[in-house]
Amino acid sequence: MVPRLKEKYQTEVVPALMQEFRYRSVMQVPRIEKIVLNIGLGEAIQNSKALDAATADLAAIAGQKPVITRARKSIAAFKVRQGMPIGVMVTLRGPRMWSFLDRLMNLVLPRLRDFRGVSRRSFDGRGNYSIGLREQIVFPEIDYDKVDKLRGLEVVIVTTAPDDEQGYALLKRLGMPFRD
């Protein structure tokens, strides 16, 4: 079964972008390559149970097992040694990516407190978009009663768009609620 958002991309977004940016081939149209979810855990240094809780939360949100990220180098000021676990991340591709993006745009973002739309300035210059969420309980998969601590997470949407303008057009047509 093709995810709803992917179907919308293929039937509505691709023809519209081909017309708007005058692409010669369908392969030139920007597409979403992957979505990376990351939870950075500063408290994992003292509290090793925080890592397990964050892993469980991210697994519930993403639908696949996250990988533990480790410190690349030692930083004495943060009491971090090289190789210490300091976060969890997961990379979504394919159907899971499409269904997550659908849930993010239609369920999660509208549930945020004081939500008026996402900023247009969060593009990185190469058509990729980043969103930071302050709490994981906005996801319907997370049981509010079982949460030990509120943790934020980063969502990075990686596209094949060469610049921010085309990346913005892609996400806007897919239904990302930008504040204009």
Curated annotation (Swiss-Prot):
Q: PROSITE patterns, alphabetically?
A: RIBOSOMAL_L5
The UniProt keywords, alphabetically, are: Ribonucleoprotein, Ribosomal protein, RNA-binding, rRNA-binding, tRNA-binding
Any one GO BP annotation for this protein: translation
Q: Name one GO molecular function term.
A: structural constituent of ribosome
Matching Gene3D superfamilies, A to Z? 3.30.1440.10
Highest taxon, organism lineage: Bacteria
Q: Which GO terms describe its cellular component?
A: ribonucleoprotein complex; ribosome
State the InterPro entries in the record: Ribosomal_uL5, Ribosomal_uL5_bac-type, Ribosomal_uL5_C, Ribosomal_uL5_CS, Ribosomal_uL5_dom_sf, Ribosomal_uL5_N
Q: How does it assemble?
A: Part of the 50S ribosomal subunit; part of the 5S rRNA/L5/L18/L25 subcomplex. Contacts the 5S rRNA and the P site tRNA. Forms a bridge to the 30S subunit in the 70S ribosome.
Read off the HAMAP family from this record.
Ribosomal_uL5_B (MF_01333_B)
**What family, per the record?**
Belongs to the universal ribosomal protein uL5 family.
Q: What does the function comment of this entry state?
A: This is one of the proteins that bind and probably mediate the attachment of the 5S RNA into the large ribosomal subunit, where it forms part of the central protuberance. In the 70S ribosome it contacts protein S13 of the 30S subunit (bridge B1b), connecting the 2 subunits; this bridge is implicated in subunit movement. Contacts the P site tRNA; the 5S rRNA and some of its associated proteins might help stabilize positioning of ribosome-bound tRNAs.
Q: Could you tell me what this protein is called? A: Large ribosomal subunit protein uL5
